Design a protein with these regions (language model features):
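Sec-dependent N-terminal signal peptides
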Residues: 5-13
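C-terminal motif of bacterial Sec signal peptides marking the signal peptidase cleavage site
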Residues: 16-19
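Intrinsic disorder/low-complexity segments in short proteins, especially the signal peptide
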Residues: 13-14, 146
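Lipid interaction determinants
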Residues: 21-159
């Protein structure tokens, strides 16, 4: 019995030392998972310099099948003019951090094709440059970043 107690204490001590060594190991961070855009919604938090005479709201939704739908609602300031809604729809590919948009179509809320070829080209040029996903909270998408009028969309967090 006299030999058993010191051996038991030695075993407990050795176990304690071994567990301390495990705690001092450098933890391995989890492998980052690619962010899925499908099923997410984004709202404009900044639309700079596009128009000073109107209130503009934007909402982007990434729906199934690799399609992004951007709805733009324009309400002229100080007049009783009608609200103008435009829907942009494009295919997207997301290779972080770049979001590439292709095959853009624009329609009115009623589903009618919109705009002149020149205006279409300008809008498509802005969006075909894609966007950048900014890693900060809230997550944001930045379109037309290098121009004077970047469009910044923040992710709508589900409650």
């Amino acid at each position: 019995m006299k030999k058993f107690i010191p051996m038991l204490l030695l075993a407990v001590f050795a176990l304690g030392v071994a567990s301390c060594k495990k705690k001092n190991e450098i933890p391995t961070p989890p492998t980052p998972q690619p962010m899925a855009l499908e099923g997410t919604s984004w709202e404009a938090k900044g639309v700079i310099g596009i128009e000073n005479d109107a209130n503009i709201q934007m909402k982007a939704e990434f729906v199934k099948g690799g399609v992004m739908k951007l709805t733009v609602v324009r309400q002229p300031k100080g007049t009783a003019a009608a609200v103008n809604t435009t829907v942009f729809e494009a295919n997207y590919v997301f290779n972080k951090p770049a979001l590439t948009l292709t095959d853009m179509k624009m329609t009115s809320q009623a589903g009618d094709p919109l705009l002149s070829d020149a205006a279409k080209k300008n809008v498509i040029e802005i969006f075909s440059k894609g966007g950048k996903l900014v890693e900060q909270r809230p997550l944001s998408l930045v379109f037309n970043e290098k121009a004077n009028n970047p469009i910044i969309l923040a992710k709508v967090e589900k409650k």
